[in-house]
Amino acid sequence: FEAGVTKDQFDNDRMFIGINHEGFEWKLEPGELLEIPEAVMVFSASGLGHMTRTFHDLYRNHLIRSGWKYMPRPVLINNWEATHFDFDSDKLIEIAERAADKGIEMFVMDDGWFGHRNSDNGSLGGWVVNKNKIKGGLKHLVNRNNSMGMKFGIWFEPEMVSPDSDLYRMHPDWVMEYHGREGTQVRNQYVLDLTRPETVDYVYESIASVLR
């Protein structure tokens, strides 16, 4: 991709972002499509603050479909800084109780609730509740949290997968890679190729099964 700004002989500025017209080529067979990322841009002659507000208005009024788009966001707390991966449901409930006393409106359970996720070395992509940590099951934890008058949220990283995971062992071809080159890991994880319909279906169904 390419992004840039040019000025012509009449002092007109032109901003552009998209496919690099010099180095990109893609062969399309009859009937095939090439879908590329969408770029959303705004203009302001009144500074960065006005540009930011224009961006917010554009997304809020025309692009966001969520029912939250005109609602104030809840004040929330999550457990990451307090626990990292070292927690169970008792510890989470203790944090939630203290937060509720302070008027916090939502508790978010962060990384470490699934698989054998006791460090960042594995289990991403296997969204199955760790019953040794979440004693009594997720529904019990959610109900306990709701009884304090707080909403409940769960951390997911659906676009990533750990090499040490059942998903990667079953479908190593589902990660983004350049054929013929060794894949790049960051934080012991790969990026899933979400251009593959089967990958998207798996991610959707595995997350939906947790939330149902």
Question: What spans do the regions from the language model cover?
Answer:
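N-terminal accessory beta-strand-rich subdomains and adjacent acidic, glycine-rich linkers
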Residues: F1-Y59
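Conserved, mostly hydrophobic/aromatic
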Residues: G31, I77, F107, N145, ...
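Hydrophobic faces of well-ordered beta-strands that scaffold small-molecule active sites
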Residues: I36, R73-N79, E105-M109, F152-F156
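Long, charged amphipathic helices and adjacent flexible linkers at domain junctions
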Residues: F55-V75
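Active-site-adjacent "subsite" loops/lids of carbohydrate-active enzymes
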Residues: P72-P74, E81-F85, P158-R212
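Catalytic domains of carbohydrate-active enzymes, especially glycoside hydrolases
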Residues: K91-F114
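Generic structural signal for well-ordered alpha-helices
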Residues: L92-E97, L138-V142, I207-A208
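Acidic/aromatic-lined carbohydrate-recognition and catalytic surfaces
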Residues: F114-R169
